């Protein structure tokens, strides 16, 4: 197993969710047990010595690898959700996507000051959702957060928008 095999397992879907977008569909990679194991093992190896105590996953595809990564790292897992999906008091942030606008919320008691945080999402495009997630995490007085992606679309330069990221790592870059 290698990164070329992982890349080959990711389906390209043209004009989704709107014309002009080439959607990187990771569901085809996730359904293959060997590919899933390789991806999570590679991400684990990168973060295993960072002292991560909380992994924060962005709804919804960030939940898939984020929760597995939290388990492997012996860390807790925190959900960043769309509005109205979390039952307790939340912080909320609105942001722009490459194809519209959206919002994210996090429980106000999700992160402690002493936590070492890893933010995980499936894909970095323009950086809108990741930057919104970092803005939410800054409400917990975290000066810097590790940030992880399965895929980065480098031509969209989303990395430049990620304020407050300590270290940004993408396993695959297109």
Show which residues each predicted segment covers.
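PRPP-associated nucleotide enzymes
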Residues: 1-174
């Amino acid at each position: 197993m290698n990164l070329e095999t992982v890349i080959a397992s990711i389906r390209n879907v043209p004009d989704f969710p709107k014309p002009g977008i080439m959607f990187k569909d990771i569901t085809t990679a996730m359904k293959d047990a060997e590919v899933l194991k390789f991806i999570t093992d590679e991400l684990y190896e990168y973060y295993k010595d960072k002292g991560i105590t909380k992994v924060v996953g962005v709804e919804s595809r960030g939940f898939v690898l984020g929760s597995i990564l939290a388990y492997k790292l012996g860390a807790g897992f925190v959900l960043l959700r769309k509005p109205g999906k979390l039952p307790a008091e939340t912080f909320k942030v609105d942001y722009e996507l490459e194809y519209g606008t959206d919002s994210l919320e996090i429980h106000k008691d999700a992160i402690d000051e002493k936590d070492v945080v890893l933010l995980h999402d499936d894909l970095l495009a323009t950086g809108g959702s990741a930057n919104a997630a970092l803005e939410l995490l800054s409400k917990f007085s975290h000066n810097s957060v590790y940030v992880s992606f399965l895929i980065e679309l480098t031509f969209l330069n989303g990395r430049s928008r990620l304020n407050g990221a300590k270290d940004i790592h993408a396993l695959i870059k297109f």
